[in-house]
């Protein structure tokens, strides 16, 4: 695993965070050291796949990055005639994802596409995964994507939505942000790295509150919506059609 040192030295002109070749190379290390509970979420995605994925259906991993969630789901699917479709708009991520998937043998076919998830059809889905992806979409595009997912899910299908959350209570929000930064420092990131990455993400990652997510999903039509995992200001929800 290549260590993430992308923000370890001062960057004179700090642009917006992008999922380019440099990020793709260090992504597994970056996300493990940056997202509290990430490994637990990936493991649980497999458990949810075992429970919710049905025969003769599709599984979608929207914003699949290097394929961790895709592989976790695939390892735990025991139903026949299931196909997994992973989609990411970063070509470097897609290339590494394909290599990662190919390294593990399975009878379950996986198709990895380089595309914008807003332009991909969702159909005959028993499970859709949005693992820290929705937060990078423009806020005005989120409802349309979630409606498309809902319409493409079969009855009793599940959406797994993992996100960084914002909290309405200012003190709580600041506390959880501080704890997250402390978590990153405990994982070896310097103050400079924490500060520069936060600045790079400011314009590209816009977070919602847990309540905003819940209300939006219920308004779209999901019958059951619940937060099943949270660590600091990161967490994951399930929404069942």
Curated annotation (Swiss-Prot):
It catalyses: prephenate + S-adenosyl-L-methionine = carboxy-S-adenosyl-L-methionine + 3-phenylpyruvate + H2O. Its EC number is 2.1.3.-. The keyword S-adenosyl-L-methionine applies. S-adenosyl-L-methionine binds at residues 38, 63-65, 88-89, 116-117, 131, 198. Keywords: S-adenosyl-L-methionine, Transferase. GO terms for biological process: tRNA wobble uridine modification. Gene3D superfamilies: Vaccinia Virus protein VP39 (3.40.50.150). Pfam families: Methyltransf_25. InterPro entries: CmoA, Methyltransf_25, SAM-dependent_MTases_sf. GO terms for molecular function: carboxyl- or carbamoyltransferase activity; S-adenosyl-L-methionine binding. Homodimer. PANTHER family: CARBOXY-S-ADENOSYL-L-METHIONINE SYNTHASE (PTHR43861:SF2), TRANS-ACONITATE 2-METHYLTRANSFERASE-RELATED (PTHR43861). Catalyzes the conversion of S-adenosyl-L-methionine (SAM) to carboxy-S-adenosyl-L-methionine (Cx-SAM). Belongs to the class I-like SAM-binding methyltransferase superfamily. Cx-SAM synthase family. This is Carboxy-S-adenosyl-L-methionine synthase. It comes from Haemophilus influenzae (strain PittEE).
């Amino acid at each position: 695993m290549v260590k993430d040192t992308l923000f370890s030295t001062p960057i004179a002109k700090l642009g917006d965070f992008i999922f380019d070749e440099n990020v793709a190379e260090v992504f597994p290390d970056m996300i493990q050291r940056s997202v509290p509970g990430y490994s637990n979420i990936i493991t649980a995605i497999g458990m949810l796949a075992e429970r919710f994925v049905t025969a003769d259906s599709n599984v979608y991993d929207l914003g699949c990055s290097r394929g961790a969630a895709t592989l976790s789901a695939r390892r735990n699917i025991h139903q026949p005639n299931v196909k997994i479709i992973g989609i990411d708009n970063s070509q470097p991520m897609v290339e590494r994802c394909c290599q990662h998937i190919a390294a593990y043998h399975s009878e379950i076919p996986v198709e990895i596409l380089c595309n914008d998830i807003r332009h991909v059809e969702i159909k005959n889905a028993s499970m859709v995964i949005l693992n820290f992806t929705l937060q990078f979409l423009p806020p005005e595009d989120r409802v349309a994507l979630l409606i498309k997912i809902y319409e493409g899910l079969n009855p009793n299908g599940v959406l797994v939505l993992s996100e960084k959350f914002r909290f309405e209570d200012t003190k709580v929000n600041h506390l959880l942000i501080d704890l997250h930064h402390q978590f990153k420092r405990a994982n070896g990131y310097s103050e400079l790295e924490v500060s520069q990455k936060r600045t790079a993400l400011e314009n590209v990652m816009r977070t919602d509150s847990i309540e905003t997510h819940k209300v939006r999903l219920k308004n779209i039509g999901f019958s059951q919506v619940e937060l099943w995992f949270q660590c600091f200001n990161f967490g994951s929800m399930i929404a069942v059609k």
